[in-house]
């Protein structure tokens, strides 16, 4: 199934890199995260190059529901078990900081994108897993 973004947005095709170039940083991937990093590096005066296999915004970003979120389903419990509470907390904080950074850039650059803050929900058919996830999230 083709996403609405594929149907309604004409992403300009870029020519492939054909020669060696110099840069302060190379970013692999031209999705939302890669472009945000490139923007941040430019803001501090660094020359960054974004390398994207297909088209900018054409991979995972294209297939989203146009959301920027720090909530990624049932992940806290498993993350804590695999990586520990401290690493899980840093991950959750970094995700929320990214959401705040997108909001800041949209506001400061006056980007017209109909950005809205809304509630986030996680659905599960397994009530026990949902409770365990809520407990794990509260630990963080």
Cite the ranges covered by each PLM segment.
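Rossmann-like flavin
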Residues: 82-140
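Glycine-rich active-site loop/strand segments that organize a redox cofactor
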Residues: 59, 63-94
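Catalytic P-loop NTPase motifs of RecA-like helicase/translocase cores
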Residues: 35, 57-58
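Extreme N-terminal leader/targeting segments of oxidoreductases
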Residues: 1-25, 43
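N-terminal Rossmann-like FAD-binding beta1-loop-alpha1 element of flavoenzymes
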Residues: 20-50
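Short, glycine/charged-enriched secondary-structure capping and boundary segments
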Residues: 41, 63-66, 136
